[in-house]
Amino acid sequence: MSETENQRARIKGVFSSEKSVKVGAGATLRRTMQTMYWFADEDEQGVITIQPLNPNYVPSGPKQEIPKEEFLENYAPEPEFYSSKVYPSIRKLNQTIAKAERHRVNGDTYSAEYEFGNALRVDEENIRANFGLGLTYLERGETGKADNIFQRLIKMEATFEAEHKHLFNDFGINLRKNEMYDQAVEYYAKALELSPADENLHYNMARACFAKADIEKTIEHLRTALSLNNNLEIAKKFLEYLRKNKLLPQTLSGAEPKVSN
């Protein structure tokens, strides 16, 4: 089978599943069939993930992997439902978010806030919209509102997925710029739970710890970053800064990697 045929064979679209649920109580108790709609996507390795559709016909909430055999047996394709309801809703949502992002980039933060709010009314768990609204608040210095978004983002694992890396980095930097150091530490700690071998996360955590005057943790994360990538110049320069300012413990001051010329 050719690569093109392989791509065409992958599962992607809206599917439905049915399950029997109890309705009522006592003498009125009965069973009925409940239909659920899902957005399914199969990756290059053949792993299928499903995500429920919310009442506004957009995929929302946590994704879950499902064995292919179970999927094929219990989920039915709904191409007409996708074309008539889901695709138009997803397209409109993405257009709203794109419009909001343009406003934010252009410095029109109040229009950005309005459009991100519109997007979140359609999908309150949309990662791009939550990041965008949070960044809008941070850029305005509205730390109270930004903290509300932070508390929402920190609970959603999709926040830390690779596809959102650029937004993730911007948000972390802006937390520090707004002196929200406790949130920045919690933010990077959550990310490190999911990606413990990411040297850049350890470096950013070191920056956040240093802002909190936690030198011990700063050094710990810098050393971890360099153990993962000994060529990480920004981490070497940070250690050199600590050394020059006599912030390294005496036992470590001569043992750290030197900054290369």
Regions from the language model: what does each represent?
Residues 1-101, 105-118, 122, 145:
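Long, contiguous interaction/recruitment modules in multidomain scaffold/adaptor proteins
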Residues 93, 127-128, 161-165, 199-200, ...:
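Helix-start (N-cap) detector for alpha-helical repeat units in TPR-like alpha-solenoids
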Residues 104, 138, 169, 173-176, ...:
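Position-specific recognition of the canonical hydrophobic site in helix A of tetratricopeptide repeat
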